[in-house]
């Protein structure tokens, strides 16, 4: 890139080429120029936009105008014009004439050398004059254009201030802090050591007057903006004269060079001649002295006119720039005034926001006091070597928490050292505040926060109610399970006539409970060691309790729960013994498997028949395809009818097999019932289990039957296409047989002339595909055959293929777009990591830091190069070595917000109460 820095008054310019723009390079280059710029200097683009507000792109040429009142001290010396040597003493034509007249003279070579030296001096002087003419013309043009750039700058600032006033008007919030805090001040605190009056600032009553003063300052800002606009309109921008043309001087300069070069060439030729006898043959082509003299006069006169015009324009420009800088200073003061109003508005919005959320902040303060109390207790108990680190971490945590509260509304001295607060005190306060209907929302908020802190999913009362409900449901389940076990034991004892003991793998309702093994819980699964049922007396105690949980209550409740869990483990163990007994008796049911094997064998035979039928149909389909290519197609009609009859026979056989299978299932069911009735009374329980097992086997057989039916349906759908093709072939054959003079060509033509039929699907058509589900299978099958000719599988296949192809194309296109978008996102992320931030500074931002005129002690104060983000100061560290540097590009590691204080922060020169930012950064080297 190429940068050109223009002095708006004198028109001087400084240029740097072939650089890649970065803020530090630009600032370092301007500082190296040492042109006497002040801190209030403004760098503008031709459109009047400030360089601080612009992000330059990769343009090849960038023009920057400098506006600074210190540059008005420039004095223009327009009288000094470089002189050009004269040819009157030794004209070239006289030299040539003297050489021709006095051929015997030996001094002609010296004269020619002097003439050549004179011509060289003339060319050098004219080149200097021409360069001065070009520079003067460029500076003149720059100084004439600069007022327009300055006025554009003022117009942009006017529009920006108007927009800022509009934003201020929208952000003004005309509410009273006293009204917002009325309910909070009336909040009953009981015995809490933290009250609303203690945490509020002593000057919170003055906040309403402070908010009113902001509104008054806004009205004053409106007046000042109008005054600045009027002052800007009063600046007289007189129409400046156009820059004189330098075309005449350019023409004279180039003509002078041409004539002088011709004369020098002639003299060089004369020097090459050894004798003067042939010099008469060289004739000058023109009068060199006259032409060179005329060109020199034109060049000097053009430069003189341009300098005089520029001198007069600088006089008129100086009055304009003096007026402009006066108005600009007013704009700067107004901008500082508006900036202070903006800061006050930000602080007021923060105060009003915290006033509206005062109850939530009060809850935060209570929970912070509780956290500090418990942390101090754990800190006093522990004796770890990392205590200093824990203390430092706690201090930083408290400092960060305190920074979230406004010092205008809250008393930071009280918040910094909160009193001791325990869980019992907060629990008692919750019970007391529940009696006040106006603070139910606050009660709910505090209950939720306390529940979150204690680890409950809800409030303590909700936790108790949920526990009671869960215990009631578990108690009901336990009673139900106990009744079932008692009934089962009674049934078994009635069947066997005696009680089983524990050693014989049996159970007795009157038998004593076995001892509890304390180590058995660890080996049991998780559902066996789940929390037991809480008895009703414990639930009544919990519901009648008015105080919150304590550690002793929780331990007592845990002991009772453990006892009940042990009782439930005994019941579970008895159930496991019963299950072991039942599993041993399930082995007797294996005799049913022999009967099931016969059924499975019949199913396998049926599957073989279906496979053979499928093969036969495949062969028949191939035969039909061959018959279509045969010229004597009418002779195959009996074969088609036979195939159709064979198909009907196969379907009838399948139907018979299905009916036989249903009869077999019925007989098996009857056999199972007869066997169950024939069993002895003492084996009733075993028969019930056997029946359940038989029912499960029946369900499996039914599923297998359904699978076979699905296979039959698939076979039917495949036969649909064959029948449709056969019907088409049959219709063609009939038409061909009835036509006289039938031949193969006519047959093919007639077959090709059959119009294609498009199939329209509806819900009734789909019913025919599942004809086997109906009651009247024969009638449904006949309807199914009648509808077969209306389905076109080719059209359906083409439609499905087109949809899948389109979906595949969409997938490929989306993959390419995803790859492209991902590359763009990665590139944007990499670009953002190396881009210098000018506002919205945060941790990880790349910031340019520059030294200021202010000093703190013996060190300079460094500030961040910003756009509408002032008061960001660098925390200077020795390892940064800033004493020998003019700039630093750093990566922000942390930002600490502070408030200006006249006693400690005098070096900032900021109003008291102004928020400024201390930035920690590390050096970023490229």
Curated annotation (Swiss-Prot):
Keywords: Autophagy, Coiled coil, Membrane, Phosphoprotein, Protein transport, Transport, Vacuole. Belongs to the ATG11 family. The modification Phosphoserine is found at residues 548, 552. Involved in cytoplasm to vacuole transport (Cvt), pexophagy, mitophagy and nucleophagy. Recruits mitochondria for their selective degradation via autophagy (mitophagy) during starvation. Works as scaffold proteins that recruit ATG proteins to the preautophagosome (PAS), the site of vesicle/autophagosome formation. Required for atg9 anterograde transport from the mitochondria to the PAS. Required for nitrogen starvation-induced sexual development and for entering the dormant G0 state. InterPro entries: ATG11, Atg11_C, Atg11_middle, ATG17-like_dom. Homodimer and potential homooligomers. Interacts with taz1. One of its GO terms (cellular component) is cytoplasm. This is Taz1-interacting factor 1.
């Amino acid at each position: 890139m190429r940068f050109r820095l223009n002095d708006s008054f004198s028109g001087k310019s400084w240029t740097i080429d072939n650089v890649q723009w970065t803020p530090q390079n630009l600032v370092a280059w301007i500082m190296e120029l040492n042109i006497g710029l002040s801190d209030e200097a403004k760098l503008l683009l031709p459109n009047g936009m400030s360089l601080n507000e612009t992000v330059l792109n990769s343009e090849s040429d960038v023009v920057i105008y400098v506006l600074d009142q210190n540059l008005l001290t420039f004095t223009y010396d327009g009288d000094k014009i470089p002189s050009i040597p004269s040819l009157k003493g030794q004209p070239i034509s006289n030299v040539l004439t003297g050489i021709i007249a006095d051929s015997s003279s030996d001094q002609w070579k010296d004269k020619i050398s002097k003439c050549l030296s004179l011509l060289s001096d003339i060319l050098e002087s004219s080149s200097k004059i021409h360069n001065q003419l070009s520079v003067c013309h460029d500076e003149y043009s720059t100084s004439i254009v600069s007022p327009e750039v300055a006025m554009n700058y003022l117009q942009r600032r006017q529009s920006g201030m108007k927009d800022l006033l509009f934003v201020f008007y929208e952000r003004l919030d005309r509410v009273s802090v006293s009204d917002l805090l009325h309910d909070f001040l009336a909040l009953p605190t009981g015995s809490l050591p933290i009250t609303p009056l203690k945490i509020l600032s002593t000057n919170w009553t003055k906040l309403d007057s402070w908010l009113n003063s902001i509104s008054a300052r806004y009205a004053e800002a409106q007046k000042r903006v109008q005054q600045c606009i009027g002052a800007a309109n009063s600046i007289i921008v007189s129409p400046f004269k156009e820059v004189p043309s330098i075309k005449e001087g350019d023409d004279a300069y180039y003509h002078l060079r041409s004539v002088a070069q011709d004369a020098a060439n002639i003299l060089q030729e004369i020097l090459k001649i050894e004798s003067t006898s042939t010099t008469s043959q060289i004739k000058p082509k023109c009068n060199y002295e006259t032409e060179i003299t005329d060109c020199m006069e034109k060049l000097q006169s053009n430069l003189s006119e341009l300098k005089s015009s520029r001198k007069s324009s600088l006089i008129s420009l100086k009055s304009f720039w003096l007026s402009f800088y006066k108005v600009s200073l007013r704009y700067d003061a107004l901008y500082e005034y508006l900036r202070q109003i903006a800061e006050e508005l930000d602080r007021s919005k923060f105060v009003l926001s915290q006033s509206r959320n005062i109850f939530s902040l009060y809850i935060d303060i209570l929970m912070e006091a509780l956290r500090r109390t418990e942390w101090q207790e754990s800190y006093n108990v522990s004796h770890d070597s990392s205590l200093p680190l824990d203390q430092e971490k706690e201090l930083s945590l408290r400092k960060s928490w305190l920074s979230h509260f406004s010092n205008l509304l809250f008393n930071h001295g009280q918040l910094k050292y909160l009193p001791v607060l325990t869980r019992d005190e907060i629990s008692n306060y919750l019970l007391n505040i529940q009696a006040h209907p106006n603070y139910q929302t606050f009660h709910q908020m505090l209950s939720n926060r306390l529940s979150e802190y204690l680890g409950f999913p809800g409030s303590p009362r909700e936790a108790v109610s949920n526990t009671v409900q869960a215990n009631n449901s578990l108690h009901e389940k336990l009673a139900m399970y106990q009744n079932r076990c008692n009934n089962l034991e009674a049934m078994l004892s009635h069947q066997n006539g005696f009680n089983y003991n524990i050693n014989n793998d049996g159970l007795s309702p009157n038998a004593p409970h076995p001892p509890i093994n304390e180590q058995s819980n660890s080996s049991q699964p998780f559902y066996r060691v789940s929390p037991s049922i809480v008895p009703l007396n414990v639930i009544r105690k919990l519901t009648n309790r008015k105080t919150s949980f304590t550690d002793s209550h929780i331990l007592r409740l845990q002991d009772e729960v453990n006892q009940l869990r042990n009782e439930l483990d005994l019941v579970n163990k008895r159930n496991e013994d019963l299950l072991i007994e039942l599993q041993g008796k399930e082995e007797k049911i294996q005799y049913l498997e022999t009967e099931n094997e016969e059924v499975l064998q019949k199913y396998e035979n049926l599957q073989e028949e279906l496979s053979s039928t499928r093969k036969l149909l495949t062969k028949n389909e191939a035969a039909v395809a061959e018959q279509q290519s045969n010229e004597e197609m009418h002779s195959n009609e009996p074969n088609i009818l036979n195939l159709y009859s064979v198909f009907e026979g196969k379907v009838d056989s399948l139907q018979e097999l299905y009916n036989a299978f249903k009869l077999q299932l019925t007989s098996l069911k009857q056999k199972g019932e007869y066997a169950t009735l024939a069993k002895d009374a003492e084996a009733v329980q075993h028969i019930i289990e056997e029946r359940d097992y038989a029912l499960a086997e029946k369900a499996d057989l039914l599923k297998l039957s359904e699978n076979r039916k699905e296979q039959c349906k698939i076979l039917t759908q495949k036969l649909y296409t064959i029948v449709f093709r056969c019907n088409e072939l049959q219709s063609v054959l009939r038409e061909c047989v009835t036509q006289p003079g039938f031949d193969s060509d006519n047959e093919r033509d007639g077959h090709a002339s059959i119009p294609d039929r498009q199939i329209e699907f509806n819900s009734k058509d789909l019913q025919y595909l599942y004809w086997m589900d109906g009651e009247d299978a024969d009638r449904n099958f006949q309807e199914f055959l009648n509808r077969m000719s209306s389905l076109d599988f080719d059209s359906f296949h083409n439609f499905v293929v087109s949809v899948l192809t389109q979906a595949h194309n969409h997938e490929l296109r989306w993959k390419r777009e995803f790859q492209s978008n991902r590359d763009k996102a990665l590139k944007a992320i990499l670009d953002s990591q190396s881009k210098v931030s000018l506002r919205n500074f945060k941790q990880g931002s790349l910031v340019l830091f520059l030294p200021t005129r202010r000093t703190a002690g013996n060190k300079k104060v460094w500030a961040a190069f910003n756009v509408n983000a002032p008061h960001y100061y660098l925390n200077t560290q020795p390892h940064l070595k800033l004493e020998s540097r003019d700039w630093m590009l750093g990566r922000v590691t942390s930002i600490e917000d502070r408030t200006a204080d006249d006693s400690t922060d005098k070096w900032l020169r900021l109003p008291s109460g102004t928020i400024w930012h201390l930035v920690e950064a590390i050096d970023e080297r490229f």
